[in-house]
A protein has these predicted regions:
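N-terminal secretory signal peptides
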Residues: 1-10, 21
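Divalent-metal-activated hydrolytic enzyme cores
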Residues: 16-17, 22-23, 37-81, 107, ...
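Short glycine-/acidic-enriched loop or helix-start segments at secondary-structure transitions
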Residues: 27, 98-99, 150-152
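Sec/Tat signal peptide C-region and signal peptidase I cleavage site
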Residues: 31-34
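Short beta-strand segments
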Residues: 89-91, 113, 140-144, 224-229
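Active-site cofactor/substrate anionic-group-binding motifs, chiefly glycine-
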Residues: 92-95, 99-117, 122
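Gly/Ser/Thr-rich loops at beta-strand to alpha-helix junctions
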Residues: 94-95, 144-149
Length: 236
């Protein structure tokens, strides 16, 4: 017989121990997935093929808005596992949705977004997970024309404009790209800074993560970059 009037006492230590067991049993096995699982995965394709798929998808989107994708299709299959063909580090700008821009289905892209498409420690960890556990063959850093955060970095760098809250920290991460662009004396300072920020992101992905860097050196992973044109829909 159950005694519903008596509740077991749980100490803080027992709760922590239980949570630790759950994490170990439920999450950690995903890291270092079996080789045979990765070989059978649909995303086990060369980096060059993954990049070509993105290019083809963007061409479709820019031409006619892309395919009429049923986002509910194959929902049951996606519950079992995710097998994205690429990782995308994109700006948070609401006009720059990677899945739509590249005309991809749910489950095709592993996306990390923040204002200014900046490489952060959390972003690095996310892509390290995608490389080691999901086997993505490609990571693209995606900037866009007219990026407001890069414009703020320009103002902070050239006009010494003060920014509120945590914005200075974000702008500081972009400032090296602005300085590099300024040294090249471009006719369009903002456009050049946006492009340099993409290049900076690509470099940081390879140099700040041993996991990502080694995957690139081994030829298993490619780091690419692009700038999205809001007017034409084209990524270059």
């Amino acid at each position: 017989m159950c005694d519903y009037g008596t509740r077991p006492k749980l100490s803080r230590r027992s709760l922590i121990a239980g949570a630790s067991t759950f994490l170990t049993a439920g999450m950690l096995p995903r890291f270092g997935a079996r080789a045979e699982d990765k070989e059978a995965a649909p995303n086990a394709i060369p980096p060059s093929e993954a990049l070509e798929r993105l290019k083809a998808g963007n061409a479709r989107f820019a031409a006619d808005g892309g395919k009429d994708i049923d986002f509910s299709a194959k929902r049951a299959a996606r519950v079992k596992a995710e097998q994205p063909i690429a990782g995308i580090l994109s700006c948070s700008d609401s006009r720059v949705p990677p899945e739509i821009i590249f005309d991809q289905r749910p489950g095709d892209l592993f996306v990390s977004r923040n204002a200014g498409n900046v490489v952060s420690s959390y972003g690095l960890a996310s892509f390290e997970f995608a490389v080691t556990s999901l086997g993505i063959p490609l990571i693209m850093v995606l900037g866009h024309k007219g990026c407001g955060v890069v414009l703020s970095a320009l103002a902070a760098s050239t006009q010494r404009k003060e920014l509120p809250g945590h914005l200075p920290e974000l702008v500081k991460a972009i400032e090296p790209a602005v300085i590099t662009a300024h040294g090249k004396h471009p006719s369009d300072f903002l456009a050049a800074s946006i492009e340099e920020n993409v290049r900076l992101g690509m470099k940081r992905l390879k140099t700040k993560s041993k996991i990502i860097g080694e995957a690139v050196m081994a030829g298993k992973l490619k780091i690419a970059g692009g700038v999205y044109d809001l007017e034409t829909g084209v990524v270059k």
